[in-house]
Curated annotation (Swiss-Prot):
Keywords: Amino-acid transport, Cell inner membrane, Cell membrane, Membrane, Symport, Transmembrane, Transmembrane helix, Transport
The organism of origin for this protein: Edwardsiella ictaluri (strain 93-146)
Entry's family note: Belongs to the dicarboxylate/amino acid:cation symporter (DAACS) (TC 2.A.23) family.
Location in or out of the cell: Cell inner membrane
Transmembrane parts of this sequence: 14-34, 44-64, 82-102, 141-161, 178-198, 217-237, 290-310, 330-350, 356-376
NCBIfam families listed in its UniProt record: PRK13628.1 (NF010151)
Major location category of this protein: membrane
Catalytic activity: L-serine(in) + Na(+)(in) = L-serine(out) + Na(+)(out); L-threonine(in) + Na(+)(in) = L-threonine(out) + Na(+)(out)
Function: Involved in the import of serine and threonine into the cell, with the concomitant import of sodium (symport system).
Protein name: Serine/threonine transporter SstT
Record-level GO BP terms: serine transport; threonine transport
Length: 413
């Protein structure tokens, strides 16, 4: 009985990363020894993707509305430079992801037919489609998975509810918690879903699919390394006009390393607070900027959304021009700012970006499933970049402000 309880505890409370790794290995093993069994196991993957597809629209709608409705005003802190750095870093990371994706295009193993796709003719058609999706009926948007329409209605409802009573705001917040709990339950089935997806994909397409995922993972991690070691130091140097690398490496070592294993920006907040204190930063500033950064500073998420979306477009042979790629960078940056509240991280926001290219929700959720397969490393690297950048930009803004007023600057490393 104790063994049974221990097994149940491992399933419900054990490391999701470890369970996904087990599912990944078992899926490969099943595909190697039994093609028919692997294809049959694909039902588990189909159910998992369908569950994600069902819950994602409701999650985005409730989460965004609750976040805006419960936003607090009147916080008196010198936050503008830090917020600007957060937004600049996230958008610039999306641009880096676009460049890397064009330089090293990735192919995904998707079960789809290109003939079913109606790609946009260019930026004008994309913008026209975008505007039409914005004014979609909210119920139709939820039912059809029109994430742009869902966002528009969620923002509108959230702004309206900011003037509601505290009781109403609490109800909306409770709804957000309830939906997030359901998503967490769905995510707990990720190992089974990954097992089915990997086994059926390998059985139907062969082991070449693994190389496709390996290439995609290399593109993702390569873009994140470029941002961490090149782009972010350039931004820091632009602000403080001195060698940025002591601070960059300190943040990566003391914040990024723990975030890599916790895979949670929120869980890494105490680590970042302690690092800010160690660096001698203004407590009134970092007490606000670090929790805020865990919510809106999402360079890693912007990279994930951009790379996977462009990989899907490349796989479906959809031509992407430069203006559309720039629009994707902007959309990815905006989506990334909301990724922290999503239990699946940035992956569940990929369908929104995919909709820019006329990619159906069915195929977009297959891309999300690919993200879960590579998520063991992708999510860890993404969180490490996101969380370490919170401290990096907070320290940068504090040092720049202190130097502009002639005060003694904080210790950089």
């Amino acid at each position: 009985m104790e063994k049974h309880s221990g097994f149940v505890r491992f399933i419900t409370r054990g490391s999701l990363v470890g369970q996904i790794l087990v599912g990944l290995v078992l899926g490969i093993a099943l595909a190697s020894f039994s093609q028919s069994g692997a294809i049959a196991a694909g039902l588990l993957g189909t159910l998992f993707v369908s569950a994600l597809k069902a819950v994602a629209p409701v999650l985005v709608f409730i989460l965004v509305a609750a976040s805006i409705a419960n936003h607090r005003q009147g916080q008196k802190t010198n936050m503008r430079p830090i917020v600007l750095l957060y937004l600049l870093g996230t958008f610039a990371a999306a641009l880096v992801a676009v460049v890397v994706s064009f330089a090293f295009p990735s192919q995904l193993a998707l079960v789809s037919h290109t003939n079913d796709i109606t790609p946009p003719g260019g930026i004008v058609e994309v913008l026209q489609s975008l505007l039409m999706n914005v004014v979609d009926n909210p119920f139709h948007a939820l039912a059809s998975g029109n994430f742009i329409g869902i966002l528009a209605w969620a923002i509108g409802l959230g702004v309206a509810l900011r003037h509601a009573s505290d009781t109403t705001k609490r109800v909306v917040g409770d709804l957000s918690y309830g939906v997030t709990f359901i998503v967490r339950v769905v995510i707990r089935f990720a190992p089974l879903g990954i097992f089915g997806l990997v086994s059926s994909t390998l059985a139907e397409t062969g082991f070449d699919a693994l190389w496709g995922y390996a290439h995609l993972l290399m593109v993702l991690i390569g873009a994140m390394l470029l941002v961490a070691l090149v782009l972010n130091p350039l931004i820091v140097f632009w602000k403080i006009r001195r060698n940025p690398y002591p601070l960059v490496f300190t943040c990566l070592r003391e914040s990024g390393l723990t975030a890599f294993f916790t895979r949670s920006s929120a869980a890494n907040i105490p680590v970042n607070m302690e690092l800010c204190k160690k660096l001698g930063l203004n407590e009134d500033t970092y007490a606000v900027s670090i929790p805020l950064g865990a919510t809106i500073n999402m360079a890693g998420a912007a990279i994930t959304i951009t790379v996977l979306t462009l990989a899907a477009a490349h796989t479906l042979e959809i031509s992407v021009d430069l203006p559309t790629a720039l629009l994707l960078s902007l959309v990815a940056a905006v989506c990334a700012c909301g990724a922290s509240g999503v239990a699946g991280g940035s992956l569940l926001l990929i369908p929104l970006a995919c909709s820019l290219f006329g990619i159906s929700s069915d195929i977009a959720m297959q891309v999300v499933a690919v993200g879960f397969i590579i998520g063991v490393l992708q999510d860890s690297c993404e969180t490490a970049l996101n969380s370490s950048t919170d401290v990096l930009f907070t320290a940068t803004a504090c040092v720049a402000a202190e130097e502009s007023t002639g005060d003694s600057a904080a210790e950089l490393g």
